[in-house]
Amino acid sequence: MTLSIPPSIQCQTEAACRLITRVTGDTLRAIHLYGSAVAGGLKPNSDIDLLVTICQPLTEAQRATLMQELLALSSPPGASAEKRALEVTVVLYSQLVPWCFPPSREMQFGEWLREDICQGIYEPAQQDWDMVLLITQILETSIPLKGERAERLFTPAPAAQLLKALRYPLDLWQSTADVQGDEYHIVLTLARIWYTLSTGRFTSKDAAADWLLPQLPEDYAATLRAAQREYLGLEQQDWHILLPAVVRFVDFAKAHIPTQFT
């Protein structure tokens, strides 16, 4: 099946590609579109997810230019009828072929960083286990906007490293403060981790929620259902009130998510 860029995001995606190509120049190896745009369908608050693969580290000038100019092309979720939030991850090819564990990413742009970027604060290159999951998803479903198809560039991560990457976020969410402000995203991420470890496959956030809901006690199902409804743009939730329920859901999920692929 030949995938194509959804018409609703084509102009914004092409503008982002032109910017990335101009700034990275001869170091650019590939740009891939992945995520909801090509697998599961765009939802009201879905990002446009781009992976940029380069052959040389970014200079500080390149990093600053990308961060600042991506701000103008991106919009916070739900804030604009014309633009979506961009999530742009930049990685060195040498981190992925051959695999380094954990791999490092050169740069990541996302709307959650907008305030820092506006102040000229840019994250440096850093290790990121999520790169293993990202490449796994791209190998399953993606569109090459520049360069070769994913299966010609990348190789799958070994199962043991994929398992480590899937379970790594579970150690990050230890307290109420760790989940506050990102409640529905964390709840849906846990559903996706649960789905993948149980089935060996990746799926969209709302599909993972649909799969998990019938298996949960009602108290926990209600929290997941609330997160799913906000993600789908059906109902805005008051997460300040729901925070204790979210913490209980996180604790329950961490206790019941498989420790191995089943």
Curated annotation (Swiss-Prot):
Effect ascribed to mutating K205A: Loss of streptomycin and spectinomycin resistance, no ATP-binding, near wild-type streptomycin binding, significantly decreased spectinomycin binding
One Pfam family linked to the record: AadA_C
GO molecular function terms attached to this record: adenylyltransferase activity; aminoglycoside 3''-adenylyltransferase activity; ATP binding; metal ion binding
UniProt: streptomycin binding residues: W173, Q174, S175, T176, A177, D178, H185
Binding site for Mg(2+) 2: D47, D49, E87
Region Adenylyltransferase domain, annotated ranges: 1-157
Keyword match Nucleotide-binding: yes
Outcome reported for the amino acid change (mutating D178A): 5-fold reduced MIC for streptomycin, 1.5-fold reduced MIC for spectinomycin resistance, reduced streptomycin but not spectinomycin binding
Residues reported to bind ATP: S36, S46, D47, D130, K205, Y231
Inducing factors: Induced by growth in minimal media (at protein level). Under positive control of the stringent response regulator guanosine 3',5'-bis(diphosphate) (ppGpp).
Effect upon mutating D182 to A/N: 4-5-fold reduced MIC for streptomycin and spectinomycin, very little spectinomycin binding
Active site: residue positions: E87
Consequence of gene disruption: Loss of streptomycin and spectinomycin resistance.
InterPro entries for this protein: AadA/Aad9, AadA_C, NT_sf, Polymerase_NTP_transf_dom
EC number(s) recorded for this UniProt protein: 2.7.7.47
Reactions accelerated catalytically: streptomycin + ATP = 3''-O-adenylylstreptomycin + diphosphate; spectinomycin + ATP = 9-O-adenylylspectinomycin + diphosphate
Positions bound to Mg(2+) 1: D47, D49
Coiled-coil stretches noted in the UniProt entry, renumbered to this chain: none
Keywords: Antibiotic resistance, ATP-binding, Magnesium, Metal-binding, Nucleotide-binding, Nucleotidyltransferase, Transferase
Domain comment (free text): Has an N-terminal adenylyltranferase and a C-terminal helical domain, with an ATP-binding cleft between them. Upon ATP binding the two domains reposition, antibiotics bind in this cleft.
Subunit field text: Monomer.
Function per UniProt: Mediates bacterial resistance to the antibiotics streptomycin and spectinomycin, does not confer resistance to kanamycin. Binds ATP first, then antibiotic.
The protein, known as: Aminoglycoside (3'') (9) adenylyltransferase
Name of the coding gene: aadA
